[in-house]
Amino acid sequence: MITLTDCSRRFQDKKKVVKAVRDVSLTIEKGEVVGILGENGAGKTTMLRMIASLLEPSQGVITVDGFDTVKQPAEVKQRIGVLFGGETGLYDRMTAKENLQYFGRLYGLNRHEIKARIEDLSKRFGMRDYMNRRVGGFSKGMRQKVAIARALIHDPDIILFDEPTTGLDITSSNIFREFIQQLKREQKTILFSSHIMEEVQALCDSVIMIHSGEVIYRGALESLYESERSEDLNYIFMSKLVRGIS
């Protein structure tokens, strides 16, 4: 379970203090799959980074399975797998297999556990044919698949994805969605931001909408369509579409 209590995060700009996340309080239950919606700069990634113990909140408390993200970061990171948009965390001079072996060791897996996890993940994501090739020569989509496998190498109970299907072709995106459905059946807790409405509808139990750092909606996507925030939802996805074709 993930709990945020009165959480804010401020950044010092050259001329002013920017409040990226504002007074957020919410709870995400075990096994819940939650989509995070919001325009660029709304605070989605900042909130995910705080949950992952990669950023400290300026105020408030965040706990992951009862562990404080500031006071007990090691315990938090052991329970969470993370993938942030544009940041694969991979080493270009190492092969895909070597990258996964390295991160497996960082998480304390033994040799047999690492081998089994790599075999499983490479099969699921169709990566067997290029596991022994250096990541530096991969396409964006291939790198993204290895990065997803890297986030899952230690079989975490909680997974945070920031636009996880960015760079993937349709086939790979569908494989990813099928894998998320399996993780749901395994009662994994998943948070991911996305600008793909079909993806959110297909995978999420509920959604969080963020605007200017504030959580302005938390609940079922179907109810959001009927709420006063439906215009905000249309803005988010239409603005993304316009940027994509301009």
Curated annotation (Swiss-Prot):
The induction annotation reads: Induced by ethanol and the protonophore carbonylcyanide p-chlorophenylhydrazone (CCCP) and, more modestly, by sodium and potassium. Positively regulated by the two-component regulatory system NatK/NatR.
Q: Which UniProt keywords apply?
A: ATP-binding, Ion transport, Nucleotide-binding, Sodium, Sodium transport, Translocase, Transport
- Domain (ABC transporter) spans 2-237
Superkingdom in the source lineage: Bacteria
Q: Which InterPro entries match?
A: AAA+_ATPase, ABC_transporter-like_ATP-bd, ABC_transporter-like_CS, ABC_transporter_ATP-binding, P-loop_NTPase
Record field: catalytic activity: Na(+)(in) + ATP + H2O = Na(+)(out) + ADP + phosphate + H(+)
Functional note: Part of an ABC transporter that catalyzes ATP-dependent electrogenic sodium extrusion.
Q: How does it assemble?
A: The complex is composed of NatA and NatB.
Q: Which family does it belong to?
A: Belongs to the ABC transporter superfamily.
Write the protein's name: ABC transporter ATP-binding protein NatA
